[in-house]
Amino acid sequence: MKRGGKREGAGRKQIHGKEYRIKIEDEIINLLNANFHGTTINDKIRGSITLGLETLLQSNKEWNKQYTVLDLFSGAGGLSRGFMDAGYNVVLGVDFDEMALKTFEANHGSAKSMKLDLFDHENINQIEQYLNERNIELDVLVGGPPCQGFSLAGPREANDERNTLYTAMVKVAERLKPKAVILENVPGLLKLYEGKGAQRIVEDFENIGYKIKPEILYAPEFGIPQIRKRVFFVALLESEEYFKFPDPVLFPHEFITCEDAISDLPALEGILGEEIQEYPMPPQTPYQELMRKNADKLYNHIGTIHSEKTVKLISMVPEGKNFKALPEEYSSQFKYNEALTRYHSKKPSLTINTGHRSHFHYEHNRIPTVRESARLQSFPDDFIFYGNKTQQYKQVGNAVPPMLGYHIALQLKNYLTKEHKHETIQYS
């Protein structure tokens, strides 16, 4: 073959929709030509090249595989929605809140839901039976056991049964052997009972063959317009290494603000609004574009009509301040530190909670709507919440921000695909 001559298709391979070209030096080509029928160096070279390409193809295939996910204590399914958005196949959500499960099923593709009391470990049999009947091999188990028992925010007792609800996840992991387990909770868990609570979780998973490590993630660093910290325990089955948590994607000066997140939504000052609404304007920021990507109508954006007294009090609170900014005749009525807190338009919001009476819109004299709270939690607008307003606020506040789940899910794929790197790949 002449130098520079055209070889049809030589060194090219289509991989995941892209064309890759490998340069093969003429000396190697000559060796291949001279020994084409032998079993000498040409076979080794051809084999190495083909093996490399097939390994890359296999890697792409495994990266794009829809790993199965089971969500325990799912609530509305914020954590598993993040996994779904990262290309995973969410197959089942389990919780005891019937309306939250209705929301879960409506927003997780073909996933089903199951109402079970997970404090009763006998109910785990139903989960196992459901998966076995459908020949579903579980890849990933995720869950956020109720945090009230662990949280530093409320009364805690060592014998609070909610402190042990995480053991349902241990039992499911022991029975179904998922490749990875992600357990989410409040950061205070790491300090609870002088760290003994967290240590027990680690030991329980280690005893059934998992390498487990906790880490606190700060939501604004991952593109979520909300000051929220959560601890994640990530356990890898029969792994020699700990999970490396994803690196932050934003610096403080880049954090998404309240205004970035919700300024395109109807004002609803003094009115309730409709169940289904049109957007009043195009997206104003990249974050709004992302939230509206798959939505053409607006849901869960119903306002609240406050009393004249409440509106008067709210109107006197500047951006980013709370009741302490009021004249003493009013401020003395409040004791709770976050009472009458107004969001700041140029900062992320405070932590969204299950209540909805303490925080107020940065501009309008009302509490945020369910949709505004959902935006601040990184729920996209096509994620529709069911139930009455109180139930919807609870679902939003209890959830893990989907975007946090998304970043963990992408990072986890690096570990799930490693299982295949030592497999024998046939080539000819």
What is the predicted function of each stretch?
Residues K61-K177, P187-K191, K196-A198:
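Core alpha/beta nucleotide-donor-binding catalytic domains of modification enzymes
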Residues P282-S428:
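C-terminal target-recognition/interaction regions appended to catalytic cores
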Residues H37-N60:
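Short, basic amphipathic alpha-helical segments that act as recognition/interaction helices
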